[in-house]
Amino acid sequence: TVHIRGRIRVNSWRLSEDEAERRVRALESNPPIEQDGNTIRVGHIQDSSLRRNVSISYEIVVPAETRVASMTGSGNQTVAGVQRPLRVETGSGDLKITGVSEARANTGSGNIEIESARGNVYAQTGSGNIQAYDIDGGFVASTGSGDVKLRQAASGSVSVETGSGNVEVNGAKGSLVLHTGSGDITADGVPRDPWKLEAGSGNITLRLPPTAAFDLYAHTGSGGIESDHPITVQGKVNRHELRGKVRGGGATLEASTGSGNIRIQ
């Protein structure tokens, strides 16, 4: 069973009271809901004269196994408990997603928050922060301007890019690719697969377990490199560049910043 509740709002300062009332009554008598078999489409107002200066907020309750694709030109969206692949988009607004399987979230301008996902997650915003917690799969995120924070709960590849903002990843258990044009990068986890971290301008901090074994390449254009882990250095020792093996070597760990310090803890 699907339950749909809508709240109609009319910008009455641009319309007469009678015209505003007419539009509300027209939408109430013929709500923008279409059903074709098992597919339900909500929110498409065919009459262009009714669309102007009118907005509708929806509260929709569906079975957990419903496939949901939700798109709006402007507005916030909250989705919880959907166990089929989910797609959520808004031109401008915040997105909050909780307790889902696979999810794709996109906003032109706004923040994205995702918690407890059992599959892969894809998140993109033109301007805004991205936060994702307890992700049980892969994670791909990008923002033109904003911070990205991830707490990973199970193995999966991670790719994060921000034009300007900080990147923080906790519990990484798979391959890791992190990039920021301007901002700091902080990552902790177990580098069993290749890690590549790049900052145009900012510090890079890695927190690794005391038993971690990996091949290290670290480079900074302007800054220092410090490591709490024993490194068998390969090549010349240089304040701005370090190459070597930690505990016999393993997966490749590459960290580079144009301007900033690199610290391996």
What are these regions (language model features)?
Residues 1-265:
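Intrinsically disordered, low-complexity terminal regions
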